[in-house]
């Protein structure tokens, strides 16, 4: 047969290869994210990384439109049923990328609330390592999936409805402890668990150096608010000053008097305590001097705006099922705090209007922050697909007392592109108007406070990074500031200034992410690509200084990890020269945009009095006309030496919250410029070697320094016995840490007070009477992060 030349416009190939070529180069990822990794995943969609080069730039809003599910972040047991449901709703063929250490294996979160790898409930094609992986790593994961599709799949027979062939994910779901190791490092010698693995604590887990002298916790200066003798007189001597307290004025009070004492403090004619800061519980059952403590202690932290400072009311409880009166009749913000205490400790509050679990699933057994509850997921039965099918969320109708026939109930979340994370809003509608709402939280609860009870004091710093995962070292600062106050550590001036500079850079970065995504929430698509470009410029500086991006874990108790690198000042100057012009561009895009303004003006209003009543802090409080900023009012970390203004706006609406954050970027730029200009010389970490690793030259000349190096390197430093609460002005509001030391190298209790928790609790006040479309603008204007909310 005579050979004929094939025309140049004809390509011969196998049908399998043609189908795989089309599928690999047009992946349709679902708009789905779980935690920190999702932010880096979304960064890969912006201009610096440009995932559109790989044909995967269009995020699909529903699982039925998508063929790629990226598990970007931690897999929580409360969220696992929804993950499985979303996966099963995707059409075939479908693929899964597990992004980040938490999704791959649980990562650093071997804790009761976290599934130890998403491959225990759904199959996975590609695992991307990192915590979080950089955008480049995610892009490599996409390329590996494309290569897998091209090389391994034979879809033609499936497409033609014939027997045989393969397409989509074919790997099995694994069972923890059966088809996968419960410890990713494998067994130790002769099958013995490795010392200090997720399976077994190291033999020397607790302190071996009680005989080492350390100074007692220092007594800090704090106001008495004119209370001398007042409570003792009014309550007949049943309320007394706690003389051992060193961080704030503290009173001991019997449980039955708590609401009356709180009501008196709130209603004082002079210097009233307008805000309930937090309700903190401590299980005292494992104290080393057990006879000195009750079974439980409940601490009420109050804030005074007139005489800036905090006050603590402390009450003691006994028994397996302790109970005290609810404070919700005095402070409405006590609602969620008391529910959390019930959920985590089993403490009941008589008279609470709706005492049920808030963070854990409704069918959870036990109370996780009690000392007898397991620390780790690997101490509990493996989580399986059957568990994910069995454990389901409460029906929406259970969140309301009465539902009329004309009422429509809708679920917004826990997976929705407009919710800024995994959270479930239950809306009660009359037409499209919101007449009531409730919030189901805890889908991002990863047991940070429980983890704090098993890490030594410095080991916990990386976990703080992942609370507000957009705020970076701001999280470190809140934690180390509280520990330093407990220990009486003096931080060198250079370290203080370095901390301020990096904290303000992260404030700008956090506000930029908020500004871009908030604009997108109300229909403006351009700003998000601009703001992420500027965020990358900040991250270039952060990476130069710390070596990390989102989670530097760079602050240390007593200072910072190391000195600033050569060239840091030039990089900072370049950014300071660049950013003001960009800020003007954002305002040109948004401030005078009639649609943007119409979507925000007068929407989601909360008054100044309501904001104080419900514990609103940060930009959201200042948007109500309240000039309250902890950097000015209760200064910390040297902020009293910097010059800046406290921006305020009137109105308390979405527009005011937008204007505040834009102006705060300007003020932060001003602070960073002062840090660059006035950076002092000297040490970058304290020379109090009881608490830090000494410099090598000091260990060679001073035996005490060498001893402290050995102790701190082997088991970590141990603060004096005591407790301390202090807070900082984080980007989203006030972030505080209440740390309790029993004199050991691990904390006895770590309480994390975050701004997102009270802000989301107050959401019904801002939402009733508005439309569903307005609701998305309202929740966007608040600026919350799910890890900050659920911890």
Curated annotation (Swiss-Prot):
UniProt membrane topology term: Peripheral membrane protein
Renumbered residue ranges of the record's region NADH dehydrogenase I subunit C: 229-384
UniProt entry keywords in alphabetical sequence: Cell inner membrane, Cell membrane, Membrane, Multifunctional enzyme, NAD, Quinone, Translocase, Transport, Ubiquinone
Enzymatic class: translocase
EC number: 7.1.1.-
Major subcellular location class: membrane
NCBIfam families to which the protein is assigned, alphabetical: nuoB_fam (TIGR01957), NuoD (TIGR01962), PRK06075.1 (NF004739), PRK06411.1 (NF005012), PRK13292.1 (NF009808)
Subunit relationships: NDH-1 is composed of about 13 different subunits. Subunits NuoBCD, E, F, and G constitute the peripheral sector of the complex.
Protein name as catalogued: NADH-quinone oxidoreductase subunit B/C/D
Organism: Geobacter metallireducens (strain ATCC 53774 / DSM 7210 / GS-15)
């Amino acid at each position: 047969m005579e050979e004929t030349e094939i025309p140049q416009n004809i390509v011969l190939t196998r049908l399998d290869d043609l189908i795989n070529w089309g599928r690999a180069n047009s992946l349709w990822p679902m708009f789905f994210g779980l935690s920190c990794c999702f932010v880096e995943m979304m960064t890969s969609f912006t201009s610096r990384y440009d995932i559109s080069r790989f044909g995967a730039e269009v995020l699909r809003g529903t699982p039925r439109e998508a063929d790629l599910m990226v598990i970007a972040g931690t897999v929580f047991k409360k969220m696992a049923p929804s993950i499985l449901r979303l996966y099963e709703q995707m059409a075939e063929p479908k693929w899964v990328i597990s992004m980040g250490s938490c999704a791959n294996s649980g990562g650093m979160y071997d804790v009761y609330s976290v599934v130890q790898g998403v491959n225990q409930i759904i199959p996975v094609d590609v695992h991307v390592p990192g915590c979080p992986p950089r955008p480049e790593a995610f892009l490599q994961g996409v390329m590996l999936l494309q290569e897998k599709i091209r090389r391994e799949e034979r879809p033609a027979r499936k497409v033609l409805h014939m027997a045989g062939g393969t397409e989509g994910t074919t790997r099995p779901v694994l069972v923890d402890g059966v088809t996968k190791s419960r410890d990713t490092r494998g067994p130790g010698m002769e099958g013995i668990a490795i010392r200090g693995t997720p399976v077994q604590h190291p033999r020397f887990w607790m302190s071996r150096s009680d005989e080492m002298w350390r100074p007692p916790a220092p007594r800090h200066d704090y106001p008495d608010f004119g209370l001398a003798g007042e409570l003792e007189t009014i309550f007949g001597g049943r309320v007394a000053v706690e003389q051992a307290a060193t961080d704030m004025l503290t009173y001991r009070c019997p449980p039955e008097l708590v609401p009356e004492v709180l009501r008196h403090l709130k209603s004082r004619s002079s210097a009233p305590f307008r805000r309930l800061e937090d309700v903190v519980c401590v299980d005292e059952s494992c104290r080393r001097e057990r006879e000195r403590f009750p079974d439980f202690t409940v601490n009420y932290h109050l804030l005074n705006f007139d005489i800036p400072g905090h006050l603590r009311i402390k009450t003691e409880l006994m028994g397996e099922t302790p109970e005290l009166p609810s404070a919700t009749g005095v402070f409405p913000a006590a609602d969620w705090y008391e529910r959390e205490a019930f959920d985590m400790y089993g403490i009941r509050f008589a008279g609470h209007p709706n005492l049920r679990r808030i963070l854990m699933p409704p069918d959870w057994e036990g109370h996780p922050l009690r000392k007898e509850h397991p620390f780790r997921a690997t101490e509990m039965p493996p989580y399986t697909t059957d568990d994910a099918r069995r454990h389901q969320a409460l029906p929406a109708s259970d969140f309301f007392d009465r539902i009329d026939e004309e009422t429509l109930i809708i679920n917004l979340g826990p997976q929705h592109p407009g919710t800024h994370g995994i959270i479930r809003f239950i809306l009660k509608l009359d037409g499209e108007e919101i007449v009531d709402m409730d919030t189901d939280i805890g889908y991002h609860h990863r047991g940070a406070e429980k983890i704090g009870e098993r890490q030594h004091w410095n080991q916990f710093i990386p976990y703080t990074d992942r609370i507000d995962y957009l705020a970076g070292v701001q999280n470190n600062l809140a934690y180390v500031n509280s520990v330093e106050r407990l220990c009486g550590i003096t931080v060198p001036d250079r370290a203080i200034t370095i901390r301020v500079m990096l904290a303000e850079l992260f404030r700008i970065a956090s506000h930029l992410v908020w500004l871009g995504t908030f604009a997108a929430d109300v229909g403006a698509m351009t700003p998000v690509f601009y703001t992420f470009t500027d965020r990358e410029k900040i991250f270039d500086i952060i990476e130069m200084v710390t070596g990390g991006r989102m989670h530097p874990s760079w602050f240390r108790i007593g200072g910072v990890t190391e000195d600033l690198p050569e060239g840091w000042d030039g990089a900072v100057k370049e950014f300071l020269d660049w950013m003001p012009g960009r800020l003007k561009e954002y305002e040109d895009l948004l401030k005078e945009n009639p649609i943007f303004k119409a979507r925000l003006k007068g929407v989601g209003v909360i008054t100044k009095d309501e904001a104080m009543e419900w514990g609103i802090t940060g930009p959201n409080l200042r948007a109500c006309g309240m000039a309250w900023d902890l950097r000015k009012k209760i200064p910390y970390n040297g902020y009293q030496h910097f010059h800046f203004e406290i921006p305020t706006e009137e109105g308390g609406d979405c527009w005011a919250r937008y204007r505040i954050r834009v102006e705060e970027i300007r003020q932060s730029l001003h602070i960073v410029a002062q840090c660059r200009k006035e950076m002092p010389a000297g040490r970058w970490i304290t020379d109090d070697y009881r608490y830090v690793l000494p410099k090598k030259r000091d260990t060679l000349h001073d035996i005490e320094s060498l001893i402290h190096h050995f102790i701190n390197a082997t088991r970590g430093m141990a603060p004096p016995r005591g407790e301390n609460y202090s807070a900082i002005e984080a980007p989203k509001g006030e972030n505080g840490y209440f740390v309790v030391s029993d004199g050991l190298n691990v904390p006895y209790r770590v309480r994390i007070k975050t701004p997102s928790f009270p802000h989301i609790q107050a959401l019904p006040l801002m939402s009733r009477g508005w439309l569903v479309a307005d609701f998305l603008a309202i929740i966007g204007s608040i600026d919350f992060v799910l890890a900050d909310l659920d911890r």
